[in-house]
Amino acid sequence: KEFSTGMRARLNMIAALSHGARLLILDEPTSGLDVIARNELLDIIREYVQDDCSVLISSHISGDLEGICDDLYMIHDGEIVFHDDTDVLLDEYGMLKLTNEQYAGIDKINIRYILKCDYGYDCLTDNRQFYVDNYPDVVVEKGCIDSFLNIVEKGERV
């Protein structure tokens, strides 16, 4: 009998869990799954890590990473180019949208990456609150993993 993509993913996960391993290495475990199957698989992973086990996930689906991972690593061309706790990333990091004039006059002490764009600069900061408090005219967005990955990959490290 033919299994759906979701059923195959669940079957693969059950097979992996049946070995009693304390570490699972999963490559794109939710790729190609519909929302329901993906959420079910993520729930299985969450249950697994509550038993003092670990999972290393390689994924391009950033929403899955935000909801399940403790640490986020970005690997580009075989090199770790970014690492931080996912909670820190979501709570403290942010994206600054700066005109050329704003960029020239802003304190860059907390800027980690910059990306030149049509209106000026996108900047990744690891201290969003610093810019909210000290630069009220600057657009400061709470970041998401997608925006971080984009600027880390395409931008320049400061």
Per-segment meaning from a language model:
Residues 1-63, 67-70, 76:
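ABC transporter nucleotide-binding domains
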Residues 24-25, 29, 102-106, 128-134, ...:
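Short, surface-exposed beta-strand/loop "edge" segments at domain boundaries and coil↔beta transitions
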Residues 32, 80, 94, 136-139:
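Short N-terminal micro-motifs specific to bacterial/archaeal maturation
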Residues 39, 90, 146-149:
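Generic structural signal for individual residues within well-ordered alpha-helical segments
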Residues 42-56, 60-125:
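ABC transporter nucleotide-binding domain
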Residues 113-158:
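C-terminal coupling/interaction segments
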